[in-house]
Amino acid sequence: MISRFEPKIIVLSLPKCGSTSIDRFSSLYCNSIHETWHSGITDAIIKYKLGLFPKLSLLNYFDFKYLATEVEVDSSTYNHFLFEDLLERYSESSFICVLRDPLSWCCSMLNMWGYFGRLVLFARQDSVSYDMKEIRTWISWINRYGTLYAPSLNSFSVFRSCQSDSVRLLLPVFEQLLFFWIAYHKRLLHSISSKSNQVKIFKISELDRLARYLGVLLSIPFANKLTMPIENKKLPIAISSIGVSRAINLLSPSSFERLCNNLLLKEAALIYSLALNKAY
């Protein structure tokens, strides 16, 4: 039996929902992690979903991580995949989820994966200056990780579609992401209705309120005056050294609203409204 260390706070938000800001804030006051063991655990999650990795072994992975780091705040962006099990396994922890509207979230995911594709394609043009082996390993993992959210989410295809100004090419993966957002938040709302004291939802537009809530949980002096720092995404060294602007042809929700399946849009709007009503 593995000994268990329970963090004070576990974040259940999807990626692109302020988790980097939460980590930057928390690390000022306590031991905080954000992407620790990210590739290893997400690959284990992929194998688990394929029936190639036992759930107990996957959950033990979390136990080992917490024992090794003795972390107080875990804002890892893969926690949400197993949140029901984490709620049960770490019953002494507090859980939070930052809510972002579904269309904005889908576009942000596409923009991020497109940016990743741009980075790698840029590096390939000057392969002498960069560690291409490390970059290939990283982008291979990124694209495996992307399939957890949408089977068609691939950095290169997203980037090329962005550059061609063809939103229609991205509609299938957008709808896959939207379906994921709906399914996850349905599960979350169901869990909150049965365990209302374990998960607190915060709107992404009110991260300062979240900062004050975290301040209370972490016993930080003057918690009622705390604010959340602006998010600044970190990339691996071999990637961050590539001087590529994020200014690809950015996608916006309005690009997809008139094309997306209307029933899917209505369901997403309903779930978002229900989740907003649960916001702290």
Set out the residue ranges of the language-model regions.
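PAPS/PAP-binding and catalytic site of the sulfotransferase fold
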Residues: 18-30, 87, 108-110, 199-222
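Short aromatic-enriched loop/helix-cap "lid" or pocket-rim segments at secondary-structure transitions
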Residues: 24, 44-48, 86, 107-112, ...
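Catalytic phosphate/metal-binding cores of nucleic-acid and nucleotide-processing enzymes, i.e., regions
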Residues: 114-117, 123-126, 131-142, 179-182
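Conserved phosphate-donor/acceptor-positioning beta-strand/loop module used by diverse small-molecule
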Residues: 89-111, 205
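PAPS-dependent sulfotransferase catalytic core
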Residues: 1-70, 233-238, 250, 280
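PAPS-dependent sulfotransferases, especially Golgi type II membrane carbohydrate sulfotransferases
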Residues: 1-8, 148-280
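Short catalytic-loop micro-motif centered on adjacent basic/acidic residues
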Residues: 11, 71-74, 200-202
